[in-house]
Amino acid sequence: ILACLHDSGIALLFDGGETLDGQPFYTMEYVDGGAVTDYCHASLESVDLRVRLLLQIAAALSSAHRNLIVHRDIKPSNILVNAEGQVKLVDFGLAKLLGRPMLPTMTHAGLGPMTPAYAAPEQFRNDPVTVATDIYQFAVLGFVILSGRLPYRCDPTDSLEWARAVTEEEPMTLARAFDLGEEARKPKNPARYRRHLTRDLDAVLRKAMAKDPRARYGSMDAMRADLEAFLEARPVTARRAGPEIGRAACR
């Protein structure tokens, strides 16, 4: 699958095959970087800078989707960032080609392959995985990058409770999640940072994390457009016009 992808935001595949004892292997580009959440904590002190990094990730995922590939396992350890701030999407081990049946695979507690903390509702229901699944997972990643924690209050290691939250509960607001996050992981000026966790950003992430895949953005490019609108202080399509204070007033 990875051999189909040629994008600056996706780690290159050099070779692959099987060992003499039948074990699959592949060799890929070495990425001198760490998990995206660690990079944000160490280097990105503002909401805007973190949204710009999310746009890099979204562009890489858009490239995969244009090649009819869904990643299915978007999480911090699969998004590496080097010292120059260049994103590299790695580990397509759970990826699938759209329109092709999946080979039998190991599952999590009888479900399809996934990382529960970042899995979409349809993955817990064993429903088909589509581009909308990546959009949901990307939104959870964005929520973690921006707020410092996952979008639901329960413990993700409690599989049944987490599955219930993902399929039934609404996510917290970014500001509320930020308030509940670890103090040691917050930016140096938390009050200023929190002011920029606006309703527009909440609206974008909530749309992308809709329980029904059909209610999410129709494509990663559509979500990217709303994130770009946020950065440019323009209205986002995810939010209906209303009297609430928007981003422009928070600047």
What are these regions (language model features)?
Residues 70:
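Conserved catalytic-core element of eukaryotic-like protein kinases
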Residues 32, 55, 61-62, 66, ...:
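C-terminal lobe helix-coil module of Hanks-type protein kinase domains
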